[in-house]
Amino acid sequence: MSKFLVFGHQNPDTDAIASSYGWAHLEREVFGRDAEAVVLGTPNEETAFALDYFGVTAPRVVESAKAEGVSQVILTDHNEFQQSIADIKEVEVAAVIDHHRVANFETANPLYMRLEPVGSASSIVYRAFKENGVIPPKEVAGLLLSGLISDTLLLKSPTTHVTDPQVAAELAEIAGVNLEEYGLALLKAGTNLASKSAEELIDIDAKTFGLNGNDVRVAQVNTVDIAEVLERQAEIEAAMTAASVANGYSDFVLMITDIVNSNSEILALGSNMDKVEAAFNFKLENNHAFLAGAVSRKKQVVPQLTDAFNA
């Protein structure tokens, strides 16, 4: 039987790594298939905290599926090809487990797709465990809980589904942690930005979206002090510009999210700033503007940008 590689998106966040780790376990232990969870980039500090807390060795980083000798892959926490492994079009996508929009995606063969509008891909993976009558091991439950906490900012994001609090409670019990205490510690681990270069900062959690012929890069960083991040605006803008030139982005939008007060500052550069301003009904001043109540790229930024670019 051929081996499957299971992975989340480029610039992996906690949910991308947790969901792929959990699904690979399900493939091996429940479905009896050879599957390995791998990652498309080095885990960030938040994810590293979760891995260390639950005693899990970080999955190895891969750059090419074909180079690994596999012909089939399973995607978690993404489906858009530009967010996936470099040679995604050269292998068969056997399954997708995701909670995002479907775009820039097609396959030659039928596949298993599980798409749910829930707070995290990890939520879907846990549901699959339950449906198969299996309780995930403590470390798997801990990672899945971490993925859900990360993506929903401890269930405060508008992306939180009505079923997610129960999922979180059950996973916390299996993992043996206090949901609030562990959740705050996890999120705090992801806000250490001072040690990051500007280039690293804008790449911590970044995705490219094809919007009406434009490649728009949308990145997000979590902080407890937006002003502290903006003190580095000049070097951050230089990094955004360099990344846009190197990769052909028409626009670069950075969400600087205050996880305590649930607001964001939008810092944006590019050739379509009129569309960015129209998307959020604000005026950029010195390339940035405040976006009250915004914490979710998926629900409060990308759909609005999509509408504005297609207008």
Swiss-Prot record:
Enzyme class: hydrolase
Pfam families referenced in this protein's UniProt entry, alphabetically: DHH, DHHA2
Molecular function (Gene Ontology), one example: inorganic diphosphate phosphatase activity
Reaction catalysed by this enzyme: diphosphate + H2O = 2 phosphate + H(+)
EC number: 3.6.1.1
Cofactor notes: Binds 2 manganese ions per subunit.
GO annotation, cellular component aspect: cytoplasm
Keyword Cytoplasm: yes
Family: Belongs to the PPase class C family.
Name of the molecule in the record: Probable manganese-dependent inorganic pyrophosphatase
Species name: Streptococcus suis (strain 05ZYH33)
